[in-house]
Design a protein with these regions (language model features):
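Secreted/periplasmic carbohydrate-active enzymes, especially glycoside hydrolases
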Residues: 1-169
Length: 169
């Protein structure tokens, strides 16, 4: 902090009240540190790094396309697509419909088809049914990590038809 004796290194651009840095009536005690929950992650094998789900809608069905990546236990900064290497890692996908029906896809699926899906609609237009997606990562057939999210099956379109003033978008 060039030119200031009352600021700590790294706190030059922090948004705090000036008095917290000791120039006024208080001590030189900027409130900094851990202020949200902290989690320590331990593992004996790799873990799921990310799951990307892309939806493809057709008449009477929705196909979910999965892209699952994992972190190896040796280097958590590295990301490896699951199923692209013969390293013993596979994943299984279970989708639970709003009515409780389960659809299971094993052996590192890239796609999963939902027949007669219940679509998610904006508030006031229809219902908002959610599907629970569970991805289980396994090493040599033994589960090592699980990822769970709830998703809505929906499409979005932009109405660009001309009206009396021009196009709406």
């Amino acid at each position: 902090t060039h030119g200031s004796e009352d600021a700590m290194d790294g706190f030059v651009n922090i948004r705090k009240a000036h008095c917290m840095f000791g120039w006024d009536w208080g001590a030189h005690l900027p409130d900094a540190g851990i202020f949200r929950p902290v989690y320590l992650l331990t593992m004996t094998e790799g873990r799921i790094d990310s799951v990307y789900i892309r939806q493809e809608h057709e008449e009477g069905k929705v196909t979910l396309h999965f892209d699952v990546s994992r972190n190896p236990k040796e280097d958590l900064r590295k990301e490896i697509p699951v199923g692209k290497e013969a390293d013993g890692y596979t994943y299984e996908v279970t989708v639970t419909a709003p009515d409780g029906t389960k659809i299971i896809a094993k052996d590192t699926p890239e796609d999963l088809v939902i027949e007669q899906p219940k679509l998610w609609w904006p508030n006031g237009v229809g219902e908002q049914p959610l599907y629970e997606v569970n991805v289980t990562l396994a090493k040599d057939g033994q589960p090592v990590d699980r990822w769970t999210r709830k998703i809505g099956l929906r499409t979005m379109t932009m109405d660009i038809h001309p009206d009396e003033w021009g196009e709406s978008f």
